[in-house]
Amino acid sequence: MILSIESSCDDSSLALTRIEDAQLIAHFKISQEKHHSSYGGVVPELASRLHAENLPLLLERIKISLNKDFSKIKAIAITNQPGLSVTLIEGLMMAKALSLSLNLPLILEDHLRGHVYSLFINEKQTCMPLSVLLVSGGHSLILEARDYENIKIVATSLDDSFGESFDKVSKMLDLGYPGGPIVEKLALDYRHPNEPLMFPIPLKNSPNLAFSFSGLKNAVRLEVEKNAPNLNEAIKQKIGYHFQSAAIEHLIQQTKRYFKIKRPKIFGIVGGASQNLALRKAFENLCDAFDCKLVLAPLEFCSDNAAMIGRSSLEAYQKKRFVPLEKANISPRTLLKSFE
């Protein structure tokens, strides 16, 4: 088995993945959302301190799953990029300690690659090559995944990420963090879903294949300020619905532009923000229109988790892509390349 560790942001997670058949044997996770909610976003120093507390607790649960028999573990895998430096280092320190004490090889995994492999948890075979939309609090990307060693970025955000924009809109409406499920519920509760959108679709007439949410976010801010004296629940629902609809339509329009160029046969959606049901439905319709197979990460594995890191590290294990402890380091940025 491979013991995998994830600590790139505000989720502490450990998992055990069986090498022979890619089955997830154990998966444990502690979310920090309640600790960061009062700040309206993740506080790096607080996240680091909580990882230092939570990772050892999760390791104890792993020990119970193994009946304290660590001989079943053949390698340690750790997310080392991209992410918050102060949280990545907490996971890396644990991984190094385990690798040294158990005399096991160390695998360094890219967090974005891990999200791609969230599509294949509990599956020995992958459906690569495929294209992937990754939407989360930190990223809005289209990736082309040819195989484990060839995953490249073909489109990214010029400013805020999709998930980050939901967090900021929720904060504008004084509704808390994380904003994704909060704004999604506002949209679901809105009673007039068929009216024309009140917010502009970003980059609608731009030839660039990219994402942008800052202009949409600013339009929401102006609407909130206009209604500030009477920002009741009905108005919040209206703003939430129209913002979500415009944000998703922007993803659809840009992805449609990509589809017309590349005509992918298989398209995946991953990342924490991919739990949004309206987004999933919109992409079902888009893929149907282009005769493209849609694959979705299971809801429980959309947000950051060690199971996806364990699954992706199986490929590295088979290729013996191990890293000496003295060369193991972290990076706040991904080293995945962009297509020219």
From Swiss-Prot:
The keyword Ion transport does not apply. It is an enzyme of class 2 (transferase). Keywords: Acyltransferase, Cytoplasm, Iron, Metal-binding, Transferase, tRNA processing. The keyword Transferase applies. Substrate binds at L134, V135, S136, G137, G138, D167, G180, N276. GO terms for molecular function: iron ion binding; N(6)-L-threonylcarbamoyladenine synthase activity. It is found in: Cytoplasm. Required for the formation of a threonylcarbamoyl group on adenosine at position 37 (t(6)A37) in tRNAs that read codons beginning with adenine. Is involved in the transfer of the threonylcarbamoyl moiety of threonylcarbamoyl-AMP (TC-AMP) to the N6 group of A37, together with TsaE and TsaB. TsaD likely plays a direct catalytic role in this reaction. Belongs to the KAE1 / TsaD family. This is tRNA N6-adenosine threonylcarbamoyltransferase. It comes from Helicobacter pylori (strain ATCC 700392 / 26695).
